[in-house]
């Protein structure tokens, strides 16, 4: 299961559709708090997190995940509006190009060799 956290309903729906059409099971949420609640109940295969989530930003969520032995290993793809250093986590700039998102997802979920993105 991929956990998608995106505050924009239109973008969230579009990205969810792209991922589902590629054969992935997706749980989509709008806030960092909702993402944290999902993560307390299940461990997804991959996180796609917007950096500008409400009530718990994407950056804060990433830091929490890095310090939790239950979640530190989950790969992350970040979404954002500007280039930032996320210490090895791939960042897709908005507007997200679907093929680039799918390339990152496939990179992590197919076990292909990579050099970052894990917590």
Model-derived regions, located:
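Acidic di-acidic motifs
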Residues: 6-7, 94
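Two-component/phosphorelay signaling modules centered on CheY-like receiver
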Residues: 9-27
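Residue-level signal for the "D+5" position in two-component response regulator receiver
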Residues: 28, 55-56, 95
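Acidic, metal-coordinating helix/loop segments flanking the phosphotransfer/catalytic sites
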Residues: 28-46
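Conserved phosphotransfer microenvironments
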Residues: 50-67
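A short, hydrophobic beta-strand element within the central beta-sheet of small alpha/beta folds
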Residues: 72-83
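C-terminal output helix
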Residues: 96-117
């Amino acid at each position: 299961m991929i956990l998608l956290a995106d505050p924009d309903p239109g973008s969230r729906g579009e990205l969810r559709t792209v991922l589902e059409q590629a054969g992935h099971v997706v749980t989509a949420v709008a806030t960092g708090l909702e993402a944290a609640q999902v993560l307390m109940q299940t461990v997804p295969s991959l996180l796609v997190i917007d950096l500008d989530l409400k009530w718990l930003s994407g950056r804060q969520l990433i830091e929490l995940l890095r310090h939790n032995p239950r979640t530190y290993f989950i790969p992350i793809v970040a979404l954002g509006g500007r280039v930032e250093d996320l210490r090895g986590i791939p960042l897709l700039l908005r507007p997200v190009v679907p093929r680039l998102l799918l390339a990152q997802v496939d990179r992590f979920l197919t076990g292909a060799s990579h050099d970052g993105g894990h917590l």
